[in-house]
Structure formats: C-alpha cells, structure tokens
Regions:
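Residues that scaffold the ATP/ADP-binding catalytic core of kinase and kinase-like folds
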Residues: 23, 27, 218, 246
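C-terminal accessory region of radical SAM enzymes
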Residues: 144-190, 220-257
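Conserved glycine-rich "GG(E/T)P / GGGxP" loop and the immediately following alpha-helix
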Residues: 6-185, 198
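A detector for short, charged/polar N-terminal pre-domain segments
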Residues: 1-4, 187-195
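Short, small/polar residue-rich loop motifs at catalytic or cofactor-binding pockets
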Residues: 200-203
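Short, acidic, Ser/Thr-enriched surface-loop or helix-capping motifs
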Residues: 209-210
Length: 257
C-alpha cells in the first residue's frame, strides 16, 4: 500500500483548520456551518501524516485547504514551516478568498514560511449574484493592496498572476454559480444534467484529509461537525502506515472502478 500511494497519489489535501469566514451560495458552507475559529487538526494526526509522507519521500503536491479559509488560522504559518521541514520536496499550494491579505508583506510571509503557490478567488458577497462591475472593483482593490499594477488584459480577463519572491500568486474572479461544482450533489443548482459513466480519476490520484483526520472520497466531498456522509475512514495516529492502508482500502478501491 505504501508503494501504491507513492506511485499514484499526486495530491494530498490537508485541511488544517475548520473555520471559514464566508458563506458563498455556491458552497456547502452556505448552509452547513464552518464557524468554529478554534478547531484545528489534532496534533497527533498532523504529526502522523507528516511522518508518513516523509517516510515515502513524498514530492508531489499538498493542498492546504478544503472548505476552510486557511489564512484565518493563527497557526497556519507555523504549520506550513513544519510541513516544509518534514516533507521538503512537496509543492505546497492553497486557495484563499484573500480576505486576510492586507499588504504585500503578507505574501512575503507566506513565501518565507514555505508556500509555493497561492490562488486567490475574489468571491461575490453572500447571496449575491456574480456581476462584472463588482468583480472589476474587487480585483482593482486587491491589486492595490498588494502593489500590483494591473494591465488592460488583467481587467478584461479578471485575472492576474505574478511572483512574490518564489511564491507564485494567481488572482481571479470566476463565476462559480456557472462554473462551480455541485460538491457531491449538495449544491442542487450545480448538479450535472447527466450522470457520468466513466470512472473519476480523483480517488486514484488524490488523498483527502479533513480537519479532524477523517478521510473523504474526494476533495468535493463536504464534511463538518454535523454532516459526514462521505467519510471513508479516520487516520490512526498510532499507525505510521495508516494513510497508506486507507488509500488501499476496499472503500477507495471500489470508488476507482
């Protein structure tokens, strides 16, 4: 199972905290809360995951968020430094709303602690529909905060990217009400009209760990304190092979067929 994990897993999603400050209408958090600011991944599970990844010399991507706002956590920078120390070859990336970025210095801090890539989405306010005028204002405001000079194409495409030190930064204003995912069918308006026939590659190439150490079928599977319909298993911090055994388990094996 260790060798299978090393061979096939290209992305480990590691959600280190619970809280999200937003409740976008194209996300399950809109109806299923993520309000606990203090809830974070248990220390023994965090250490166990890092030790396991270190053991196989993991060098693929680690995504540092699921349904939380990662930058809301006061321990975020410290934990990223610990990941970088223990799994130095991994590419550390995350998505964020940008709400906790106040200046270019905040991006420099992320670069210094070991984040490699960050994707900022300028979200619409709760229960509002996407509109271009609002998004243009948002992207201009954010660019000003981080001292980025926008070109005509940036405004036209509602996106820009640049390097802050070694940190690759991308900012965009996607209309997720049109282009979003139903998150395992929870967002009814985004459910596809036809059911897919072909198997999905996500259970093969991704391994998804929620804030409490439970493992989900896929990064689109929602989980919070009251909703846990897609939990596959829970990491055993006393077993250094736990993530590998879960990856090779019957539940995930069946999901790949």
């Amino acid at each position: 199972s260790e060798q299978l994990f090393k061979k096939y897993v290209e992305l480990v999603c590691l959600e280190m905290s619970y809280y999200c400050n937003r409740a976008c209408n194209y996300c399950p958090v809109h109806d299923l809360e993520r309000s606990d600011k203090d809830l974070e991944i248990p220390e023994n599970i965090f250490v166990s995951v890092l030790n396991s990844l270190n053991k196989i010399d993991y060098k693929e991507r680690i995504s540092l968020n699921l349904f939380n706002e990662p930058l809301a956590s006061k321990n975020f920078h410290k934990n990223v430094s610990r990941i970088k120390q223990k799994v130095p070859k991994a590419i550390l990336s995350l998505s964020s709303s940008g709400d906790y970025i106040k200046s270019l210095d905040d991006l420099k801090k992320l670069d210094n602690c070991g984040v490699d890539e960050i994707l900022f989405t300028m979200h619409t306010p709760k229960d509002k529909t996407w509109n271009r005028e609002y998004c243009e204002k948002q992207i201009k405001r954010f660019a000003k905060k981080i001292q980025f000079s926008l070109g005509e194409n940036n405004i036209k495409n509602l996106s820009f990217s640049f390097l802050a030190g070694k940190l690759h930064v991308t900012v965009y204003c996607t209309d997720w009400n049109k282009l979003g995912n139903s998150r395992g069918g929870l967002i009814k308006k985004l459910r596809p009209e036809k059911n897919r026939i072909n198997p999905c590659e996500k259970p093969i190439r991704e391994f998804v760990i929620s804030y409490d150490g439970t493992v989900q079928l896929c990064c689109h599977s929602y989980h919070n304190k009251t909703y846990s319909d897609h939990v596959i298993s829970k990491i055993d911090p006393k077993n250094s092979n736990s993530i590998f055994k879960i990856y090779a388990s019957k539940a995930l094996t069946l999901a790949r067929k």
